[in-house]
């Protein structure tokens, strides 16, 4: 898409949204498989597919990519608060979640029942020395979410009532919702 055919702010938003979904896809893959090949450039078709056989990246490199992508794109979303599209809040929530996963994996590296399955290449497992940095990134993203007004649904004094109402409240009335699928 050229910048002349669409407003610059919309173009930045759509590009940020595409990068968000790419990072989200990498998050789902790294949780499932550990390190996966990280491809950020468009690949061209060629007769010999050998150059397309990219080796797995370290698990930590995938988490680092997700976190850095969310930091890079968060301002491109502007002040949009649409709960059914990627926004700055959704980017910070994904950063928070990815950093928490990576931080707890690293923190528990030496206690893991699957430690013997970790590959020496780093494709699986994250060394414990990285735990503090990931957990700090998680807390920073959480603080940004709170500063944007996201919080637990607390309309009633009774916690059980709040829990029940959180699922039936209109999306615009629920400060817990960051990124959701809308139903009529």
Each model region followed by its residue ranges:
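An aromatic- and glycine-enriched ligand-binding surface/loop that stacks and positions planar moieties
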Residues: 15, 34-36, 40, 63, ...
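Conserved, well-structured interaction surfaces
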Residues: 1-33, 49-85
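Short linear capping/connector segments at secondary-structure termini
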Residues: 42-48
């Amino acid at each position: 898409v050229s910048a002349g055919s669409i407003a610059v702010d919309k173009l930045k938003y759509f590009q940020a949204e595409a990068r968000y979904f790419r990072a989200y896809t990498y998050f789902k893959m790294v949780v499932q498989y550990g390190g996966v090949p990280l491809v950020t450039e468009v690949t061209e078709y060629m007769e010999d597919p050998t150059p397309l056989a990219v080796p797995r990246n370290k698990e930590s490199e995938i988490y680092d990519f997700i976190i850095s992508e969310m930091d890079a794109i968060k301002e491109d979303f502007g002040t949009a608060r649409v709960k059914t599209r990627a926004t700055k809040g959704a980017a910070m929530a994904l950063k928070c979640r990815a950093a928490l996963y990576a931080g707890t994996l690293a923190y528990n590296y030496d206690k893991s029942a699957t430690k013997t399955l970790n590959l020496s290449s780093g494709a699986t497992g994250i060394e414990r020395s990285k735990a503090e940095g990931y957990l700090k990134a998680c807390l920073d993203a959480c603080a940004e979410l709170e500063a944007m007004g996201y919080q637990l649904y607390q309309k009633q004094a009774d916690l059980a009532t709040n829990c029940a109402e959180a699922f039936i409240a209109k999306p615009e009335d629920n400060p817990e919702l960051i990124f959701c699928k809308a139903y009529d």
